[in-house]
Amino acid sequence: MTLFPVLLFLVAGLLPSFPANEDKDPAFTALLTTQTQVQREIVNKHNELRRAVSPPARNMLKMEWNKEAAANAQKWANQCNYRHSNPKDRMTSLKCGENLYMSSASSSWSQAIQSWFDEYNDFDFGVGPKTPNAVVGHYTQVVWYSSYLVGCGNAYCPNQKVLKYYYVCQYCPAGNWANRLYVPYEQGAPCASCPDNCDDGLCTNGCKYEDLYSNCKSLKLTLTCKHQLVRDSCKASCNCSNSIY
């Protein structure tokens, strides 16, 4: 079975867009993310892999299912458009990242997620790809420390010539920050950043807000959260002092 996990630049312009067909492949229908057991598989697989990172992470949040992210992911999967969605179309109350997976045969969600994670074989922590131009962005999003909400959707796209099986996961808040792209988490003993909020090596004190500026922590110190700019643009810094964000 040939599997093809790909990024936007690998497929844009090469594969046309066709809406998903209602005639579902029976095996693929069993993977629909409206089912509780499928949601559980997706969340558990992500958390299994997040616990397994090397070097270990001191601030890795435990993932949980998010219905709004799942609805956005399913809506995009239904388009059978093999490129990344517009960022505005994967907004919840947070900005969300996205991983895509296409396959020539029906794969389990665990296989799809594992394929993203396996990019770690070509990744040096804090440095980047070991091989020039190697794809590692799926891996870094899967293990991005602050991305603790996940929602996924899939579609059967029979009008595509080869890659008929389409999987989309969205992650909130989004990872892969440009200013620390190859440092997806802080190294250290598991849960060192959350000793009172730890579940088997993963932190459980995520923040439902996000900062819009990279210097929000310093803005909070100099202007305080009473300043409207800080209050409106640095919601994580102002509201999540005991959380990981």
Curated annotation (Swiss-Prot):
One of its GO terms (cellular component) is specific granule. Residues 1-20 form the signal peptide. This is Cysteine-rich secretory protein 3. Gene3D superfamilies: CAP, Crisp domain. Belongs to the CRISP family. Salivary gland, pancreas and prostate > epididymis, ovary, thymus and colon. PANTHER family: CYSTEINE-RICH SECRETORY PROTEIN-RELATED. Glycans are attached at residue 239. Interacts with A1BG. Residues 43-171 form the SCP domain. The lineage of its organism: Eukaryota, Metazoa, Chordata, Craniata, Vertebrata. Disulfide bonds join 191-198, 194-203, 207-240, 216-234, 225-238.
